[in-house]
């Protein structure tokens, strides 16, 4: 289980001001949990993900993964960013296997594992291709496969579909549900899309503008319904989905109004 306990982050801005980015954020991600942090730009979502990844120290609070304190990056956390950061001179398979190479895994085993993961994301036919030959959605699929290569306990995903067109984004959401269902990984996912948060999250954390606080939590099962039925259209068209979308939109607007009035 990932546990975030009263996590707060302050940092110094370039002009010398102290910025309060996160304020006492707490939540858990159990086995097979898919937690989505939802909020406007600048609310601390990426700061929170970077702290969980071990890229950024907390000013106060504690983060643990399976009882171990998170203090630095580790192979137990796989990260997928909005920009795929694939190495252009390496093949798709070699990009996926990069973490295994750093871990000292032999080449034959690396290639076998890379092909398994490319098959999982539907790109095994592109193993020998290079990143420039792939579309944006395909490149993000490679990024997901690469993050899974070292068999992490949790996937950390920082708006990975934000730069994609709407149709590709929906396809990637559905692919991610399939990967989550087959691998049983914990996932922490960041987005500013209400619909994406509702569709993917077993729990959605609605965050306030800076300093980022969790102002509402929603426990959901749309992702499980899709994993069972494969019918995204009826899920998103359901009255429950629409009601929750409007409720969350109202919370986000209320938080913005309070900040503007402060």
From Swiss-Prot:
What organism does the record attribute this protein to? Rhizobium etli (strain ATCC 51251 / DSM 11541 / JCM 21823 / NBRC 15573 / CFN 42)
What is the membrane topology listed in the Swiss-Prot or TrEMBL record?
Peripheral membrane protein
Cellular localisation: Cell inner membrane
Asked whether the UniProt record includes Nucleotidyltransferase among its keywords, one would answer no
Q: Please describe the quaternary structure of this protein.
A: The complex is composed of two ATP-binding proteins (TauB), two transmembrane proteins (TauC) and a solute-binding protein (TauA).
Domain (ABC transporter) ranges: 4-234
This chain belongs to the protein called Taurine import ATP-binding protein TauB
Q: Which CDD domains match?
A: ABC_NrtD_SsuB_transporters
* Principal cellular location given in the protein's record: membrane
Protein keywords = ATP-binding, Cell inner membrane, Cell membrane, Membrane, Nucleotide-binding, Plasmid, Translocase, Transport
The role this protein plays is: Part of the ABC transporter complex TauABC involved in taurine import. Responsible for energy coupling to the transport system.
Which EC number applies? 7.6.2.7
Cellular compartments per GO CC: plasma membrane
Give the reaction(s) catalysed.
taurine(out) + ATP + H2O = taurine(in) + ADP + phosphate + H(+)
Which molecular function GO terms apply here?
A: ABC-type taurine transporter transporter activity; ATP binding; ATP hydrolysis activity
Q: PANTHER family from the entry?
A: TAURINE IMPORT ATP-BINDING PROTEIN TAUB, TAURINE IMPORT ATP-BINDING PROTEIN-RELATED
Enzyme class (EC, first level): translocase
Reading the lineage from the top rank, the first entry is Bacteria
UniProt KW Flavoprotein keyword = no
Q: Which family does it belong to?
A: Belongs to the ABC transporter superfamily. Taurine importer (TC 3.A.1.17.1) family.
Where along the chain is ATP bound? 39-46
